[in-house]
C-alpha cells in the first residue's frame, strides 16, 4: 500500500501528478477502454498511408540470448507466445482460485456457470461446423468458442451499480470456465508436430514446480526460473507455449503458511509490539524498536498471504493494461479491402460471426433454462432469465481470445485476416446489442447496495 492510499498521509507532488491516471485505472471499465483504443489505433494504422510500417514493425526479428543459446523470433510471435503465456498464467491463477475458494468451489454453485460456459462453447462450434464442416476452413471451429472477459465485464460495468452482483459473478465464472475450455482446445487440437524430448523436458520442469510446492517453497523466484524452462520446453515441443502459463499457475501454492488460529495469535502479538514501539515522536530511522516492529508486521503480512494471491495481485494490472492492449495493437490491424469485405460473406466468416453472435446467446441461455427447469440450479432473487440472455449477448464478445485462437487455427493468412474481421464485427454487434438489451432490462431497477 502506498502512502497516497492511507487516510491522513500528507500528499506528495507525485500524488498530484499521478492522480488523473489513478482515477482512470480505478474505473472498472478502464482495461476495456484501453483495449478498444488499441484496436481502433491498429485498424486506423493498418488502413492508413503508414500501413507498411504497421506490418513491418511486428515482423521485426527480436533475439534473446547469445551465441548458440539465442532464441530469435518475430516481434508478433514474442507477443503471441511470450506475453500471452503471462496472460494465461494469470488466467490459470484465477481458475485455481475459483476452484479452491470461489464460485467453482461448490458443485451446486458451479453448476450454472459451468453449464452456461459449455453451452456457450458447443453451440457456437456447432454453428461454425454446420457452415464449414468438411472444408479447408473446418479447423476454425474453436474460434467462436472464446469470450473476452475484459471487454464483456467492461461493458457490463458501464451500466453502473444497477447490475446485480450475482450477474457480474456469473459472467466472470462463465468466462473463467470458457478460458479453461479454450486452453484445452489449444492444448489438444491446435498443437503442431510434437518433439518427444522437449515434451519430456517440459514434463520434468512441471514436476519440479509441483515438488517445490509440496516442499513448502513459497518464494516466487524458484517457480519463475523453472517456469521459464517449462515455457521454453513447450515452445520447442510443438505444444503451444501459452499452455506453460496455465501449468505453471497450477503449481503455485494457494494456501497460507499460517493456520488461522496461529495467524490470529501472532497478529495480536505483532500489533501489540507495533503499538508499543510507535509510542513517542522518534522518527522510524532513529528507532531500532520501531524499525523491528514494522519489519515484523511486514513478515507476518507476507506469511498470512499466499503466493497465488501475491502473483495475481502483482500481474493482473500488467495483463489488463499492458499485455492485452499490446496484443490487440499487434493483432487487430486488419487492412480492409474490397476483397476482404467480400470474404465477410464466405462460410468461414459467417460461421464465426453467427457462432459468436447467435451461438453464445443461444448456448448460454438454453443451458441456464435447462438447469432451472430441471431443478439443478435456481436463479438468484430478482434476476430473471432475460438478464441471462443479455449476458449471453455479452459472452459473444470474442475479440482478443477469439483472435488468438484464429492465429493458431488457420495457416492461410487470408483466412486469418477474414477471421479477424469477422471477430471484430461480431464482437462490436454483441457488445452494443448486449449493452442496449441490459440497459432496457435494468431500467427502473434499484442500485445494488454496497
From Swiss-Prot:
It is found in: Cell inner membrane. It is a multi-pass membrane protein. Coiled coil: none annotated. One of its GO terms (biological process) is regulation of pH. InterPro entries: Na/H_antiporter_dom_sf (IPR023171), NhaA (IPR004670). GO terms for molecular function: sodium:proton antiporter activity. It comes from the Bacteria. Keywords: Antiport, Cell inner membrane, Cell membrane, Ion transport, Membrane, Sodium, Sodium transport, Transmembrane, Transmembrane helix, Transport. GO terms for cellular component: plasma membrane. Belongs to the NhaA Na(+)/H(+) (TC 2.A.33) antiporter family. This is Na(+)/H(+) antiporter NhaA. It comes from Oleidesulfovibrio alaskensis (strain ATCC BAA-1058 / DSM 17464 / G20) (Desulfovibrio alaskensis).
Amino acid at each position: 500500500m502506498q502512502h497516497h492510499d492511507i487516510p491522513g498521509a500528507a500528499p506528495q507532488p507525485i500524488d498530484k501528478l499521478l492522480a488523473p491516471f489513478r482515477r482512470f485505472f480505478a474505473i472498472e471499465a478502464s482495461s476495456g477502454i484501453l483495449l478498444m483504443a488499441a484496436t481502433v489505433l491498429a485498424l486506423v494504422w493498418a488502413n492508413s498511408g503508414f500501413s507498411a510500417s504497421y506490418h513491418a514493425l511486428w515482423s521485426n526479428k527480436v533475439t534473446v540470448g547469445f551465441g548458440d543459446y539465442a532464441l530469435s523470433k518475430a516481434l508478433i510471435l514474442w507477443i503471441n507466445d511470450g506475453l500471452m503465456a503471462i496472460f494465461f498464467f494469470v488466467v490459470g491463477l484465477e481458475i485455481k482460485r475459483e476452484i479452491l475458494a470461489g464460485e467453482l468451489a461448490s458443485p451446486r454453485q458451479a453448476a450454472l456457470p459451468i453449464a452456461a460456459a459449455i453451452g456457450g462453447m458447443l453451440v457456437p462450434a456447432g454453428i461454425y461446423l454446420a457452415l464449414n464442416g468438411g472444408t479447408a476452413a473446418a479447423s476454425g471451429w474453436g474460434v467462436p468458442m472464446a469470450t473476452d472477459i475484459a471487454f464483456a465485464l467492461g461493458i457490463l460495468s458501464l451500466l453502473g451499480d444497477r447490475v446485480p452482483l450475482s450477474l457480474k459473478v456469473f459472467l466472470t465464472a462463465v468466462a473463467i470456465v470458457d478460458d479453461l475450455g479454450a486452453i484445452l482446445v489449444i492444448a489438444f487440437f491446435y498443437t503442431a508436430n510434437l518433439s518427444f524430448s522437449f515434451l519430456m523436458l517440459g514434463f520434468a520442469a512441471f514436476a519440479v514446480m509441483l515438488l517445490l510446492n509440496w516442499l513448502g517453497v513459497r518464494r516466487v523466484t524458484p517457480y519463475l526460473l523453472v517456469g521459464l524452462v517449462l515455457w521454453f520446453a513447450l515452445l520447442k515441443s510443438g505444444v503451444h507455449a501459452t499452455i506453460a502459463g496455465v501449468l505453471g499457475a497450477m503449481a503455485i501454492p494457494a494456501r497460507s503458511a499460517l493456520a488461522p488460529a496461529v495467524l490470529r495469535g501472532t497478529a495480536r502479538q505483532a500489533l501489540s509490539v507495533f503499538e508499543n514501539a510507535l509510542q513517542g515522536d522518534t522518527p522510524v530511522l532513529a528507532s531500532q524498536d520501531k524499525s523491528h516492529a514494522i519489519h515484523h508486521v511486514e513478515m507476518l503480512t507476507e506469511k498470512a498471504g499466499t503466493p497465488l494471491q501475491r502473483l495475481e495481485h502483482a500481474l493482473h494490472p500488467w495483463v489488463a493494461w499492458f499485455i492485452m492492449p499490446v496484443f490487440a495493437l499487434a493483432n487487430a490491424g486488419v487492412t480492409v479491402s474490397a476483397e476482404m469485405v467480400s470474404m465477410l460473406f464466405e462460410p468461414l466468416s459467417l460461421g464465426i460471426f453467427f457462432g459468436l453472435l447467435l451461438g453464445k446467446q443461444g448456448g448460454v441461455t438454453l443451458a441456464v433454462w435447462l438447469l432451472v427447469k430441471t431443478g439443478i440450479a435456481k436463479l438468484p432473487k430478482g434476476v430473471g432469465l432475460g438478464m441471462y440472455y443479455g449476458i449471453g449477448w455479452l459472452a459473444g464478445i470474442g475479440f482478443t481470445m477469439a483472435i488468438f485462437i484464429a492465429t493458431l487455427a488457420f495457416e492461410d493468412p487470408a483466412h486469418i485476416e477474414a477471421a479477424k474481421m469477422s471477430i471484430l464485427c461480431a464482437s462490436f454487434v454483441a457488445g452494443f446489442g448486449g449493452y442496449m438489451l441490459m440497459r432496457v432490462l435494468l431500467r427502473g431497477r434499484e442500485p445494488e447496495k454496497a
